[in-house]
Amino acid sequence: MEHTLPALPYALDALAPHISKETLEYHYGKHHQTYVTNLNNLIKGTEFENSTLEEIVKKSSAGIFNNSAQVWNHTFYWNGLKPNGGGAPTGALAAAIDAKWGSFDAFKEAFTKSAIGNFGSSWTWLVKKADGSLDIVNTSNAATPLTTADKALITCDLWEHAYYIDYRNARAKYVEAFWSLANWDFAAANFA
């Protein structure tokens, strides 16, 4: 099965001024595409050749895992952003956030602190635990909640290529911009 780069759910310039068109051209058009290309090359002639992306992520290791997980993580990340996003979630997700952190502002502060402090090339996730509660989880490199019992709700990509064009080494400014793009409808659908 040939894997393809999923289409973005918005135009390349739609996240500006928070994330520039140039960043998306590189991050989506080059980095994400390279993971797809590498994955297709690596799975030829293997047990994963006809597997879905999720099956590959859950069952593979080494280079195949790294590339398949990065394809999945990036696709999830793009869907977790939207033009004119931000604000706060409503409904059941908002209630679950309040139950865990006391308020959306307290959650936002905890997520931001976790993301800024997440060392190196990494991801910070809001996840739903098996018991239905929420948590903030940091992963390194290509690691993903898809391989655990946690259900990913939304993520912030903290690999340097996600923000270096726009923010250089100012990760905190990038994380601040993330809050203006967060797609709470996507997160709520994942929570349901």
Where would I find each of the regions flagged by the language model?
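Feature for soluble, non-membrane regions of globular proteins
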Residues: 1-192
